[in-house]
């Protein structure tokens, strides 16, 4: 999810 910043950005 977006909370990861770099992984959830997709």
UniProtKB/Swiss-Prot annotation:
- Coiled-coil segments, which residues? none
Q: Which domain of life is it from?
A: Eukaryota
GO CC terms in record = extracellular region
* Organism, scientific name: Rhyparobia maderae
Q: Give the main location.
A: secreted
Q: Does the keyword Secreted apply?
A: yes
Gene Ontology annotations of biological process type: neuropeptide signaling pathway
UniProt keyword terms in alphabetical order: Amidation, Neuropeptide, Secreted
**Do you know which Pfam families this protein is assigned to?**
Lem_TRP
Give the protein name, as stated in the record.
Tachykinin-related peptide 8
Compartments where found: Secreted
Function of the molecule: Myoactive peptide. Increases the amplitude and frequency of spontaneous contractions and tonus of hindgut muscle.
PTM Arginine amide: at which residues?
10
Which tissues express it?
A: Brain.
Q: Which InterPro entries match?
A: Lem_TRP (IPR013206)
